[in-house]
Amino acid sequence: MIQMQTNLDVADNSGAKRVQCIKVLGGSKRRFATVGDVIVVSIKEAAPRGKVKKGDVHRAVIVRTAKDIHRPDGSTIRFDGNAAVLINKNSGEPIGTRIFGPVVRELRAKNHMKIISLAPEVL
């Protein structure tokens, strides 16, 4: 569960290393976001020659959360930390060309197919 002020790792090669959630998209009363949701983030830490720089505001898709993800078959999955992938505001395509670490298959239901195809492992 991601809310405003949550810090997340970046799981792509866009140049950002750490981001902070500044808004959860999807209605004025929406407080939390989970895997597959789109949030607005501010870049807090970035690589020197990346595509993005510190202070930029971008949209991101959450790909891993430390909070359990419950599946219809009764299984749950959780990760050690929270991670997101930066996306283009207009097209919804990832800014980076590679994705690091596993992502969950719930992204398929939310139509983030490009992220799934770039990921090394889908859990």
Swiss-Prot record:
SUPFAM superfamilies: Ribosomal protein L14. Keywords: Ribonucleoprotein, Ribosomal protein, RNA-binding, rRNA-binding. Signal peptide: none annotated. GO terms for cellular component: cytosolic large ribosomal subunit. Gene3D superfamilies: Ribosomal protein L14. Disulfide bonds: none annotated. GO terms for biological process: translation. InterPro entries: Ribosomal_uL14, Ribosomal_uL14_bac-type, Ribosomal_uL14_CS, Ribosomal_uL14_sf. It comes from the Bacteria. SMART domains: Ribosomal_L14 (SM01374). It holds the Pfam family Ribosomal_L14. The keyword Ribonucleoprotein applies. The keyword Ribosomal protein applies. HAMAP family: Ribosomal_uL14 (MF_01367). Part of the 50S ribosomal subunit. Forms a cluster with proteins L3 and L19. In the 70S ribosome, L14 and L19 interact and together make contacts with the 16S rRNA in bridges B5 and B8. Binds to 23S rRNA. Forms part of two intersubunit bridges in the 70S ribosome. This is Large ribosomal subunit protein uL14. The gene is rplN.
